[in-house]
């Protein structure tokens, strides 16, 4: 089926499985619609590898994947490969169709905080190979970004004031997360926001909250102390840091904060349980980079906290935000170009992703901020983009998870049918049809609207609990 032999234990014994970084070709980047920033095309230098980019994640120098060594039988199209040229992801013509082969343990990786390939390959298989409709993970299939500001210390106060004067907060909504204690790097350093005794910051957060921005917790009371020292065994010492931060932020905005980000991405499992017990909806995550809102596995098991969604960061190679650009010897133009590509990507693919930054770094990245504003303005004018906040998307994802739907057919007349239902409402749930494979799409039960978007049809459900749609499949 796959055009090669693999699992050659009798022949290779202990060498049956190899380990290597994974590389995608320029063609694969387009074919699989790999997210900007996930591939590093400069990792392997020039020569035969110049058109192959290494798959990356945040902070790790390399991602090393286990894979079977293979023996070719017939020609295949290699989309991803290992350093020794072993196909990692390939397609093979078989009969009147094609077979997609993934030579990595996708499910195993999902349970260990690296599920990008699993999600991307399943999406590609369903939409591009089987050519079936898919249920969008955004309301009305509207692409967008969660722009997450991490306010770690009092070094952010003047940059925030400058952003406000420049009209930055007139757009959005954004998700602004605050570390509220009096210290930042170490105890008694006086570098924190000291939110309970900081009238300016209190007034600023109240203004942004009233304007529709989402205000949340960034840990942890003392940013670096919590970020460096909290671990699985010291809940009794550090849970009060979460309590104090939560009380301070919630008191300031006049309602309970519902979204969270961990200082330095440090999130012990007890902190996730604390979020669930306090009724939080979402948290920023440095795991599963490249995904939208997802249910992360914890210690190899699915999260037991219903309704709580992880929002992975969007990595740019091995970094995630402005502060790290100079550390990696990069130029501002590199991350500016990445953000422009990311904005275009989410808009075209009807997806939501998170990008975060520290306001304290913004004085050094004014051109990047200008690019974000101008690019967003252009995409909004085209009806292709919107800003999201974490709580809003979490509510949507919980409703989406409640949707039950299936595809029937084709029958003798070549008709296929989607039957969908929800215990509440299907409002804004959207099915995306490849236009070249579906025609005469019509709603036979329930409410909805149909519109064409480039080479796709978007079927947006109305406020009814059930929906049936028929269409003629194009061979």
Where are these regions (language model features)?
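An acidic, glycine-rich "communication" segment
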Residues: 2-77, 83, 424
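Short, surface-exposed beta-strand/loop micro-motifs that present aromatic residues
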Residues: 84-93, 342-344
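Surface beta-strand/loop "capping" patches
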Residues: 391-435
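Solvent-exposed beta-hairpin/edge-strand motifs
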Residues: 380, 431-447
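Metal-dependent polysaccharide deacetylase catalytic core of the NodB/CE4 family, i.e.
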Residues: 2-18, 168-272, 281, 286-296, ...
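C-terminal beta-strand-rich structural cap/linker in extracellular carbohydrate-active enzymes
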Residues: 427-429, 452-475
